[in-house]
UniProtKB/Swiss-Prot annotation:
Keyword Chloroplast in annotation: yes
Superkingdom of source: Eukaryota
Protein name stated in the entry: Tic20 family protein Ycf60
Organism listed in the record: Pyropia yezoensis
Gene for this chain: ycf60
Predominant location category: plastid
Amino acid sequence: MIRLFTFAIITVFLIVISRLALQRAYKYIKLNKKINNTESKTRLSIRLVSTVPYYLPLFEGLQNFGQYVLPDYPVAAIPLYKKIILPMLIFYMNHAILGLVTFFALYYVLVRNKSPIPVHQLVRFNSMQSILLFLVGSLFGAVFRAFPIEFRISFLGLMVCNMMFWFVLSTITYSIVKAVQGKYSNIPVISEAVRIQISGYST
């Protein structure tokens, strides 16, 4: 009798879980179909607005990794970095509250379902993705800073720093290019998490 009761509970539990999984999969497929149908119709102004939120993970990546490795690159882009990007980066670093304010502004104004303004799906997607990239960059930066200073200035430490910087830069560049094209980027894990997050939202 006890075994039968236990089996019945497990069966009901599996049925409920399966139903929830199917509902989630249906929403995900429906969202992807909707996304594919609207990609080619996105206006240029919306595409450009979709790239703006990526300044947040970019500056976070420059703060955590870029400022340590970029000055050693003997390329023509370094003067451009020092004259244009570095002053903005210093301003960002000196006003730590700016990143936090931008983070909450992106979420409450552009990502949230009850946004005070109508938001295009492409803008919402890229805003959410920039938030996740910002969080990933912040986490990597915190972990890297947790290591002893001897490791961080060593050859291996600079290699790790270099790798993290190029990971952040490449994902942001890829996302911006896709946004300008009016398409949705597909970064493993991160883009999937974004699609799941906005799957219940209306455009």
